[in-house]
């Protein structure tokens, strides 16, 4: 029996508040001048957001649709990969190949209860691969599997691209946020996703802590005790922080990694399934396309009910040609979800208890995450805090990315953030199994990080040559009730009576919440260690390298496809523009022969496009454009006094959505 026995504690606790004294000495060791611009990314369950700090100002960046938040969706069609708005917009037509809610699977095992619960409601297939959940979809007609890290990497890659488009240069480093209650495996997996996206994740920051930075930047006078209540699309966190003179110190954190707006949507979906079955006798609970439509409309209805008392849910030809038409009131929505709303108050009570504070000690509570717009959520919280109103000074959708960008600015040496110090905590107790299956804590929950703690243990039987170190996280007294992070053995212990050998076990928890454990035989000096990685299913370096290569291949394919689509659109817009103006504004100005020449050329081009819309290459679209412009230009130049009859040169940077760019009657 390779159990180990607790002998006596050794106080080698590196007190985390040391960071306050020398917050920037550590930074000097980092090669900050090589980071370039470091971006802040809020990788959300339903939406993601990216921000950057430049010249002391923090900017939330808009995507190509002009939206400051981007759906955390990835879709595969017969021709292409879509990410963000484009992926979400086609889900009803392509539900089994559109991936969302991937954050609910990342870093977890396939047999995890929450994973099993979630996959029942997901329209795409989730299968078991080596004990991990992976997504199975059709890519260009073939079955492919993707890990949650790969899908998250695609979303992070999209955020990276948005930042690069804004900055006009490559981005290689980022700060990424995670729920405060994410465990070690989920944090490691998120870092791996960043690597797959081509990003070096300098720091993993807890979401409520990042939001607190956004809230507290301008509150530098007296000490503030604040609670950040972060209710997003799929996760829920509460953190209690003290803020004073630029020091953000987390006192306690709690939450639920499987509670958020998606759960509220699902309650609406279930209600609509029930009423539709009652009215029409049709059960759509296994119809993926119908469920995708319901999910889309449920989210819209939920959003509408934050500002109005009732809303209509209308879906034409919902199933078998039958329309769906229902009214949902705010009162009914609140009734459906009241148990979940009330459930969010438990972690609030928990952080107050852990920090040894009372409600009256809280100066402010800050609402983060889109779900905090729900009036009933705000009402319950205000009632809990005896009528105190929530702080409305920050945008709940953008606060986390804003705070992440500020932390990115701290790490990259941006101006204006020199005095900011972030002291976060670990969310779960970390310890090892000792005699009798007892969980012996080394680092208690809500300990400031980074931190290091050592303790002396010994053997449980005479002449024991080996001890097995099993590392757990959790709050239960028995190790079997907690989450096993990893295990390793220390061998070659010289024969000795039980209790004599001294085995020093050291836990080192870094600023990202990632753990390294070592065990040293004090007698021989022999040591073994583990950084908690592959024992709990983290990707190997080979797997990460393969996924990086595939991500680059996808990005290259996306770029080629984007160029092709731009060339196709340019040609189609030009042909339609010629046709419309020949039949409209220029009809009276052109000679019949010229009019016929232009119409024939435009119609021939449009017919060719119809026949070759998907199969033609970028070069063929460009050649057709050149041929059409050579036909059109001599005719139009006669109208406007053109001299040489040569084809015009078109600027690729022009706005190609404007049909009049190529052929305009008002030059």
From Swiss-Prot:
Its main location: endoplasmic reticulum. Its EC number is 3.6.4.10. Pfam families: HSP70. Residues 132-286 are annotated as: Nucleotide-binding (NBD). Keywords: ATP-binding, Chaperone, Endoplasmic reticulum, Hydrolase, Nucleotide-binding, Signal, Stress response. CDD domains: ASKHA_NBD_HSP70_BiP. Residues 1-28 form the signal peptide. Residues 406-506 are annotated as: Substrate-binding (SBD). The keyword Transcription does not apply. GO terms for molecular function: ATP binding; ATP hydrolysis activity; ATP-dependent protein folding chaperone; protein-transporting ATPase activity; unfolded protein binding. GO terms for biological process: ERAD pathway; fungal-type cell wall beta-glucan biosynthetic process; IRE1-mediated unfolded protein response; karyogamy involved in conjugation with cellular fusion; post-translational protein targeting to membrane, translocation; SRP-dependent cotranslational protein targeting to membrane, translocation. It is found in: Endoplasmic reticulum lumen. Residues 650-667 have a biased composition (Acidic residues). It is an enzyme of class 3 (hydrolase). It comes from the Eukaryota. It catalyses: ATP + H2O = ADP + phosphate + H(+). Gene3D superfamilies: 1.20.1270.10, 3.30.30.30, 3.30.420.40, Actin, Chain A, domain 4, Substrate Binding Domain Of DNAk, Chain A, domain 1. Residues 637-667 are annotated as: Disordered. InterPro entries: ATPase_NBD (IPR043129), BIP_NBD (IPR042050), Heat_shock_70_CS (IPR018181), HSP70_C_sf (IPR029048), HSP70_peptide-bd_sf (IPR029047), Hsp_70_fam (IPR013126). GO terms for cellular component: cortical endoplasmic reticulum lumen; extracellular region; fungal biofilm matrix; luminal surveillance complex; nuclear membrane; perinuclear endoplasmic reticulum lumen. The chaperone activity is regulated by ATP-induced allosteric coupling of the nucleotide-binding (NBD) and substrate-binding (SBD) domains. In the ADP-bound and nucleotide-free (apo) states, the two domains have little interaction. In contrast, in the ATP-bound state the two domains are tightly coupled, which results in drastically accelerated kinetics in both binding and release of polypeptide substrates. J domain-containing co-chaperones stimulate the ATPase activity and are required for efficient substrate recognition. Probably plays a role in facilitating the assembly of multimeric protein complexes inside the ER. Is required for secretory polypeptide translocation. May physically associate with SEC63 protein in the endoplasmic reticulum and this interaction may be regulated by ATP hydrolysis. Belongs to the heat shock protein 70 family. This is Endoplasmic reticulum chaperone BiP. It comes from Candida glabrata (strain ATCC 2001 / BCRC 20586 / JCM 3761 / NBRC 0622 / NRRL Y-65 / CBS 138). The lineage of its organism: Eukaryota, Fungi, Dikarya, Ascomycota, Saccharomycotina. The gene is KAR2.
């Amino acid at each position: 029996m390779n159990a180990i026995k607790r002998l006596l504690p050794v106080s080698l606790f590196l007190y985390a508040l040391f960071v306050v004294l020398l917050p920037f000495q550590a930074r000097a060791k980092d090669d900050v001048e090589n980071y370039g611009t470091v971006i802040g990314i809020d990788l959300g369950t339903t939406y993601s957001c990216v921000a950057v700090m430049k010249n002391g100002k923090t900017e939330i960046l808009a995507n190509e649709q002009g939206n400051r938040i981007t759906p955390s969706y990835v879709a595969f069609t017969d021709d292409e990969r879509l990410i963000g708005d484009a992926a979400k917009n086609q889900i009803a037509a392509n539900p089994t190949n559109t991936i969302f809610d991937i954050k609910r699977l990342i870093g977890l095992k396939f047999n995890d209860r929450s994973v099993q619960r979630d996959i029942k409601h997901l329209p795409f297939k989730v299968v078991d691969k080596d004990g991990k959940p992976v997504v199975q979809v059709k890519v260009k007609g073939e079955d492919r599997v993707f890990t949650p890290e790969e899908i998250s990497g695609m979303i992070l890659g999209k955020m990276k691209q948005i930042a690069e488009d804004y900055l006009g240069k490559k981005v290689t480093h980022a700060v990424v946020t995670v729920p405060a209650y994410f465990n070690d495996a989920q944090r490691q997996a998120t870092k791996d996703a960043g690597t797959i996206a081509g990003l070096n994740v300098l720091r993993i920051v807890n979401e409520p802590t990042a939001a607190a930075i956004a809230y507290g930047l301008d509150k530098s006078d007296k000490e503030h005790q604040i609670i950040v209540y972060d209710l997003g699309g799929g996760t829920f966190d509460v953190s209690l922080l003290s803020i004073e003179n630029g020091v953000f110190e987390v006192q306690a954190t709690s939450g639920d990694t499987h509670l958020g707006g998606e759960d509220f949507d699902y309650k609406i979906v279930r209600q609509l399934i029930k009423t539709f079955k009652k009215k029409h006798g049709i059960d759509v609970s296994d119809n993926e396309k119908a469920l995708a439509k319901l999910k889309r409309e449920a989210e819209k209805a939920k959003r509408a009910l934050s500002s109005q008392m009732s809303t209509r849910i209308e879906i034409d030809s919902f199933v078998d040609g039958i329309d769906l038409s229902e009214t949902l009131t705010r009162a009914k929505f609140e009734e459906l979800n009241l148990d979940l709303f009330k459930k969010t108050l438990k972690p609030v009570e928990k952080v107050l208890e852990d920090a040894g504070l009372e409600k009256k000690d809280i100066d402010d509570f800050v609402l983060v995450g889109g779900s905090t717009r729900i009036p009933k959520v705000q009402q319950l919280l205000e009632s809990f805090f005896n009528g105190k109103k929530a702080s409305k000074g920050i945008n709940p959708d953008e606060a986390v990315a804003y705070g992440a960008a500020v932390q990115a600015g701290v790490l990259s040496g941006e101006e204006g953030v020199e005095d900011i110090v972030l002291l976060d905590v670990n969310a779960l107790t970390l310890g090892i199994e000792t005699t009798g299956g007892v969980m012996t804590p080394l680092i208690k929950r809500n300990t400031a990080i980074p931190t290091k703690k050592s303790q002396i243990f010994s053997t449980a039987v005479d002449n024991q040559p080996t001890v097995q170190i099993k590392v757990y996280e959790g709050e239960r007294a028995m190790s079997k009730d907690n989450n096993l992070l990893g295990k390793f053995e220390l061998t070659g212990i010289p024969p000795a009576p039980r209790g004599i050998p001294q085995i020093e076990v050291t836990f080192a928890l870094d600023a990202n919440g990632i753990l390294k454990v070592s065990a040293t035989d004090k007698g021989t000096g022999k040591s073994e260690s583990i950084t908690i990685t592959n024992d709990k299913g983290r990707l190997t370096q080979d797997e990460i390298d393969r996924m990086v290569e595939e991500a680059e291949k996808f990005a290259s394919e996306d770029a080629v496809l984007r160029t092709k689509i731009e060339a196709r659109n340019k040609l189609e817009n030009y042909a339609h523009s010629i046709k419309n103006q020949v039949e409209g504004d220029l009809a009276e100005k052109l000679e019949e022969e010229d009019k016929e020449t232009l119409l024939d050329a435009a119609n021939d081009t449009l017919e060719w496009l119809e026949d070759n819309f998907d199969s033609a290459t970028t070069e063929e679209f460009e050649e057709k454009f050149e041929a059409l412009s050579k036909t059109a230009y001599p005719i139009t130049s006669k109208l406007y006094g053109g001299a040489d009859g040569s084809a015009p040169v078109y600027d690729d940077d022009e706005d190609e959505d404007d049909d009049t760019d190529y052929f305009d009657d008002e030059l």
